Amino acid sequence: MTNIRKSHPLVKIINHSFIDLPTPPNISAWWNFGSLLGVCLILQILTGLFLAMHYTPDTMTAFSSVTHICRDVNYGWIIRYLHANGASMFFICLYMHVGRGMYYGSYTFSETWNIGIVLLFTVMATAFMGYVLPWGQMSFWGATVITNLLSAIPYIGADLVEWIWGGFSVDKATLTRFFAFHFILPFIISALAAVHLLFLHETGSNNPSGMVSDSDKIPFHPYYTIKDILGLLVLILTLMLLVLFSPDLLGDPDNYTPANPLSTPPHIKPEWYFLFAYAILRSIPNKLGGVLALVLSILILAIIPALHTSKQRGLMFRPLSQCLFWFLVADLLTLTWIGGQPVEHPFITIGQLASILYFSILLILMPISGIIENRLLKW
């Protein structure tokens, strides 16, 4: 009799994706982050669902409903902090996943890579809208400042901002629609993730060497399921340490003050995972230029495949490009730090230099190093 996992129409799909999937034998722990992102997404949807049962998307009661969740709902505090810190873990895994794709040349799978970029934008939009929902000071002013950036678009900017706000300022209509979008987008992300996997399984996974491994594959289960469970345990341990010991470590104290349109916080800033892009935005004194730089800081990932000049796929055997890659990582950490600092000397200059370096590495230095390394191969 045929095994049910190979004959049943539904189970067969799961079997081909997670059990009998032919996988390269040498993929490292850097390939764990895909499955961890799936776990983070499921966690966010589940905790978000329970939070939505008690949350009220109204400017008068939103802040007090979050307080009610933490104080009165049974285990509401842990659900709320799992959701808030789960978002941070989500972005850590997301940036690691993108970084691995850049390091090992996974961007040569163009369909998978492009769907991944769409996923990144969607997750960022979802996280931004989620940050607005508690209706604290930073929620309100963050929403005001970031949505107001769209007014830099010529001709339609002002109308577009009012259309998104649903009025002449961030108010009840804005909060209600942000809640609606924040609720529906994770399900769209789930669908996009399924398409992402579909395209990945068309080509098969890349591996650290960057060479084709079609002749030498092993089944995903049990080898990589065990490996993924180890990564999952590390993720759960880190998240629980964060939630149970320092739940507000990555948050902003200003968000414990109810939103007040008449009082501007001394320093408006987004969540830590957007600070690098926020620093790039602030480094350009022109509003439209800043908005373009902000969008390009993420959209630049789409042109990375076109800038690939090396004969080798990944950076495993390319020391010059490896140095540039780690310079880029250090630069992104610097930008994240600068994004959290006030707009004053010397932070302005450091931010501008770090922004120039960010675009220079990706657009100029990496392609040049690829050409140099090709020449070195001939020696």
Curated annotation (Swiss-Prot):
Protein name according to UniProt: Cytochrome b
Family of the protein in this entry: Belongs to the cytochrome b family.
Organism of derivation: Panthera leo
Cofactor(s) needed by this chain: heme b
Residues reported in the UniProt entry to bind heme b b562: 83, 182
A single MF term (Gene Ontology): metal ion binding
Misc. remarks from the entry: Heme 1 (or BL or b562) is low-potential and absorbs at about 562 nm, and heme 2 (or BH or b566) is high-potential and absorbs at about 566 nm.
Gene Ontology cellular component terms for the protein in this record: mitochondrial inner membrane; respiratory chain complex III
Subcellular location: Mitochondrion inner membrane
Membrane topology, from the record: Multi-pass membrane protein
PANTHER family found in the cross-reference section: CYTOCHROME B (PTHR19271:SF16)
